Amino acid sequence: MSSEPLVLGIETSCDETGVGIVRGHTLLADAVASSVDEHARFGGVVPEVASRAHLEAMVPTIERACETAGIRLYDVDAIAVTSGPGLAGALMVGVAAAKALAVGLGKPIYGVNHLAAHVAVDQLEHGPLPEPCLALLVSGGHSSLLRVEDVTSGVDPMGATIDDAAGEAFDKVARLLGLPFPGGPYIDRAAREGSTVYVDFPRGLTSRRDLERHRFDFSFSGLKTAVARWVEARERSGEPVPVADVAASFQEAVCDVLTRKAIDAASSAGIEDLLIGGGVAANSRLRVLAEERAAARGIRVRVPRPGLCTDNGAMVAALGAEMVARGRTPSPLDLPADSSLPVTEVLV
């Protein structure tokens, strides 16, 4: 098969129905249908609502991607789909659609890991991944540090959150501040008008004692609780809550820990390239702080454009294309949707 295979990727791990089409490392189409507005009134993603939205959006999104790419479905060399981790019902919709396409078109199918796909998508913007590289993946469901020797098979965890993920903390703090869902973009926007030192919020797992056991792990539940208590105390006193200042101080605490641990992990492993991905990677302060700290340690930083950081089908197609190009054996047609798929299992 061609070293630049034409691959269609399907992503349905959470609330975005994503269909991407790539040829090798070239992005041809990235169609996304989001159900975020349906979840906003609940203040978070509702699994049943997400699954139903995927069912409704799947065919139109596939059609839109093919039209944008200027191809017909039977032109593709392979189908790739997120098999996990994610919401079980949502994953099942994507996997079922991918299986139907694979059978109907007579094409191989590749069930891939959602987290590894967040790493692979960077190739669409910056070319082949340096190997090894360190990946910092931060989203609503994950906060992980990964050593990547080979994005198709050699992904090993160095650290992860022990409680709340960074993106989850952003959503919960946004709710405390009266900001809309999803909270990340709104906190980022509000923080631009605030002071990063207005409140000295705690940095989880950064004490000397914590670093002995959790050097590269994250914890954001304590930070979330600290913000809640600060806001509640302010409201009890009858004083207005300075939303911009609290947003900036909270965001600084998160970005400080993420970048500090990522740079430390890369340095300790002798890795000179840091890749940042996941929805929180779109945060402007995280990008700036990572660049500053990495430059001071001689580490190069790669961050995809914001549209490729959030969940999308292009990242799945990118990883699928890499699987095909490297001659990986396709997945069986009975591949499962695995909501707790470990990152070490890149191909199902």
From Swiss-Prot:
Residues at which substrate binds: 137-141, 171, 184, 188, 283
Transmembrane segments: none
Reactions the enzyme catalyzes: L-threonylcarbamoyladenylate + adenosine(37) in tRNA = N(6)-L-threonylcarbamoyladenosine(37) in tRNA + AMP + H(+)
Coiled coil regions in record: none
Record localization: Cytoplasm
Listed GO CC annotations: cytoplasm
CDD domains: ASKHA_NBD_TsaD_bac
Keywords, sorted A to Z: Acyltransferase, Cytoplasm, Iron, Metal-binding, Transferase, tRNA processing
Tagged with keyword Acyltransferase: yes
Pfam families in alphabetical order: TsaD (PF00814)
Catalytic activity, EC: 2.3.1.234
Binding site for Fe cation: 114, 118, 311
Role: Required for the formation of a threonylcarbamoyl group on adenosine at position 37 (t(6)A37) in tRNAs that read codons beginning with adenine. Is involved in the transfer of the threonylcarbamoyl moiety of threonylcarbamoyl-AMP (TC-AMP) to the N6 group of A37, together with TsaE and TsaB. TsaD likely plays a direct catalytic role in this reaction.
Protein name: tRNA N6-adenosine threonylcarbamoyltransferase
Organism: Nocardioides sp. (strain ATCC BAA-499 / JS614)
